[in-house]
Amino acid sequence: MLRTHLSGELRKENAGQSVTLTGWVARRRDHGGVIFIDLRDRSGIAQVVFRNEDVAERAHALRSEFVLQVTGVVEKRPEGSENPNLASGDVEVSVTDFTVLNESAPLPFQIEDASSAGEVGEETRLKYRYLDLRRPVQANALRLRSAANKAARTVLDSHDFTEIETPTLTRSTPEGARDFLVPARLKPGTFYALPQSPQLFKQLLQVAGMERYYQIARCYRDEDFRADRQPEFTQLDVEMSFVDQEDVIALAEEILTEVWKLIGYEISTPIPRITYADAMRLYGSDKPDLRFDIQITECTDFFADTTFRVFKNEYVGAVVMKGGASQPRRQLDAWQEWAKQRGAKGLAYILVGEDGELGGPVAKNITDAEREGIAAHVGAEPGDCIFFAAGDTRSSRALLGAARDEIARKLDLIRDGEWSFVWVVDAPMFESAADATASGDVALGNSKWTAVHHAFTSPKPEFLDTFDENPGEALAYAYDIVCNGNEIGGGSIRIHQRDVQERVFKVMGISEEEARDKFGFLLDAFAFGAPPHGGIAFGWDRIVSLLGGFDSIRDVIAFPKSGGGVDPLTDAPAPITPLQRKESGIDAKPKAAENKPEEK
């Protein structure tokens, strides 16, 4: 080894010892011919001092991020010069000799200057990600991720799970997003697909009798740009045989409990549950943030006989902003712009004066009886503001759910370090294909119905015989775990019977021929004694970003893509050469296709 000790591990007990350290020059300070350098390695920082005239003279040439090997004697710092912010702050190393292992070019941004961290653009940080990761905060994010991996593995290993790798080159199967395709050179005109999840393989492993599988899996989805999404991401993927929903939830809670212990937080279990229907009714979201107590009040029946045209709609709902009546007009106008940015025409409101009198444009257009009763109906008090949404139920609730979150931010209702977990259960099995497409998802099949979770989710037992007769009424045997308004995991009990799977495909408009072509291997496997099974997948990037207090999952990924799916470091994606294109067979037709007559 090129060193005897790590910089961040030196203590008073090491005083008098001769040590050799290696690392990077984090800071350099000259004081009357004596040079002080903060030497950084993976463990932290040690102050090394160049007092000897010969070494001090040579040290004048050292610059930020030079790589050094220094040898010297550990000494206690003079009284009053200790640094309580450093683990090694009681000591320093008096250098007797050093070697420059490598020099550094001028830096594109300062690594150690915490005050300028927010001034460096993300594109620059990602382009020089290897420098960005020298910052302790960024490096510690990856270490936290490693610790989370270890904690999860420890839990799963204790329950006799087997870690199994599944293919990353597979066939294209419809799973809810577009596939990344890889040309197969040895079979021109055909393509592999990178997996959107290990879903089908982990189910096949249950058919194989493995019973308890897990994997920290890389997944790939060619989605349109969405904030804080990555085209490649990581799941902690878990599947179990001979289980029901309660078994999977209990295991998931054990994993989450151990992972959150890494930051000193004890999750209270069992984690509360809410039905999907109640989540949408009360919070306007299937991933509600329950750190604050603001609920949506339904007002459709209250305004059933209204003369106000805006409220003559399928749905009317409201949320209350405590103290919101004191907002200036410009802030109320800003709320309208906020709503329009979300596709709404605006956000109607009533101001409840300190004397109880109602103000605002809505108050002038509703009946006397409605004016007298609306504050009590929604739970508003003098000084509050009532925001309304009216229209179709789905979009109106979504707008009120977003308003609820915005109110919490404006009123500073969310405390640092506060955690709220909830299971969302009993989601619909199917949704309108038009709604799925409108929300940015890919609707599978050629029916007006598509799966809410995926096509392999079992209906709840009470809907097993009727889900294809009344798809809109069927509930899925599924469960999502939500933390602070973020969906951090989702799972379900799977279909394990071939006839049930074929019925689901039929509801979704997937023909027998397409089902055989895309999923024949799964249907065949179900014919050979597939056990009942279920599982869950955790969004590992999101979980680690929450643990570390990061705003973006990019901070917890070693080499992330930018928001547009571009890697500024390698400049990927990039064009390929004509020779690569020819050899890959991208433009070739599959032999089977060449033998078929062209469609007219």
From Swiss-Prot:
It holds the Pfam family tRNA-synt_2. The record marks 31, 80 as: Important for tRNA non-discrimination. It catalyses: tRNA(Asx) + L-aspartate + ATP = L-aspartyl-tRNA(Asx) + AMP + diphosphate. GO terms for biological process: aspartyl-tRNA aminoacylation. InterPro entries: Aa-tRNA-synt_II, aa-tRNA-synth_II, aa-tRNA-synth_II/BPL/LPL, Asp-tRNA-ligase_1, Asp-tRNA-ligase_1_N, Asp/Asn-tRNA-synth_IIb, AspRS_core, GAD-like_sf. Keywords: Aminoacyl-tRNA synthetase, ATP-binding, Cytoplasm, Ligase, Nucleotide-binding, Protein biosynthesis. It is found in: Cytoplasm. The keyword Cytoplasm applies. ATP binds at residues 221-223, 230, 487, 539-542. L-aspartate binds at residues 175, 221, 453, 494. Residues 580-600 have a biased composition (Basic and acidic residues). Belongs to the class-II aminoacyl-tRNA synthetase family. Type 1 subfamily. Homodimer. Aspartyl-tRNA synthetase with relaxed tRNA specificity since it is able to aspartylate not only its cognate tRNA(Asp) but also tRNA(Asn). Reaction proceeds in two steps: L-aspartate is first activated by ATP to form Asp-AMP and then transferred to the acceptor end of tRNA(Asp/Asn). This is Aspartate--tRNA(Asp/Asn) ligase. It comes from Corynebacterium efficiens (strain DSM 44549 / YS-314 / AJ 12310 / JCM 11189 / NBRC 100395).
